[in-house]
Amino acid sequence: MPMILGYWDIRGLAHAIRLLLEYTDSSYEEKKYTMGDAPDYDRSQWLNEKFKLGLDFPNLPYLIDGAHKITQSNAILCYIARKHNLCGETEEEKIRVDILENQTMDNHMQLGMICYNPEFEKLKPKYLEELPEKLKLYSEFLGKRPWFAGNKITFVDFLVYDVLDLHRIFEPKCLDAFPNLKDFISRFEGLEKISAYMKSSRFLPRPVFSKMAVWGNK
């Protein structure tokens, strides 16, 4: 039985999950929900099913794998990663994984907060002003390692890739001062399974956010 990944028909919080499912050659199907247009942004496609799936904390995204029913995007990533030993091996690697799992969510949410804000155009300049310092921390944390936890890829590389790629879409030149981050992106996109997925009709890089967002809704 293939796993079922449920989410809106956008990139959003499912991008890293989809990438990890593809990288691990997992058998899965997607259940994509469509949100209505403005002004109502009808969510009935999801709400009609929300409490009928046996989820403990009903939300999107969700992953159903037989008896295992999981919500929360990072919990889903961890579940898939544990199956494939992609959580780090040494204590040092696991610490780095734990830090990045949370740091990437912070940065994802920070971008989301301004992109959904009606005052987006006013907030954007300050966000861009502060962005290099945020990216510098990632650059220094990666250093000369091939992957963020160490010599082997882990699930947080999928999260970091998502955050860096989002910011590359937001401001195309934002990574120019950080060659090791650009190299990391090239390395990640060069992975055989990832490269094949990005060329397939299943790949969904946009819309980044839902129809309610001011930026990234197309």
From Swiss-Prot:
Residue numbers binding substrate: Y116
All copies of domain GST C-terminal, residue ranges: 90-208
Record localization: Cytoplasm
Consequence the record notes for mutating Y116F: Slight increase of catalytic activity
EC number: 2.5.1.18
Molecular function per GO: enzyme binding; glutathione binding; glutathione transferase activity; protein homodimerization activity
GO-annotated biological processes: cellular detoxification of nitrogen compound; glutathione derivative biosynthetic process; glutathione metabolic process; hepoxilin biosynthetic process; nitrobenzene metabolic process; prostaglandin metabolic process; xenobiotic catabolic process
Predominant location: cytoplasm
Modified residues (Phosphoserine): S210
Pfam family, any one: GST_C
List of residues that carry Phosphothreonine: T34
Effect of Y7F: Reduces catalytic activity 100-fold
Keywords on record: Cytoplasm, Lipid metabolism, Phosphoprotein, Transferase
Binding site for glutathione: Y7, W8, R43, S44, Q45, W46, K50, N59, L60, Q72, S73
Impact when changing H108S: Changes the properties of the enzyme toward some substrates
InterPro entries: Glutathione-S-Trfase_C-like, Glutathione-S-Trfase_C_sf, Glutathione_S-Trfase, Glutathione_S-Trfase_N, GST_C, GST_mu, GST_superfamily, Thioredoxin-like_sf
Record keyword Flavoprotein present: no
Enzyme class per UniProt: transferase
Organ and tissue specificity: Liver (at protein level).
Source organism, top-level taxon: Eukaryota
Effect of Y116A: Reduces catalytic activity 10-fold
PANTHER family: GLUTATHIONE S-TRANSFERASE, GLUTATHIONE S-TRANSFERASE MU 1
Summary of the function given for this chain in its UniProt record: Conjugation of reduced glutathione to a wide number of exogenous and endogenous hydrophobic electrophiles. Involved in the formation of glutathione conjugates of both prostaglandin A2 (PGA2) and prostaglandin J2 (PGJ2). Participates in the formation of novel hepoxilin regioisomers.
Annotated protein name in UniProt: Glutathione S-transferase Mu 1
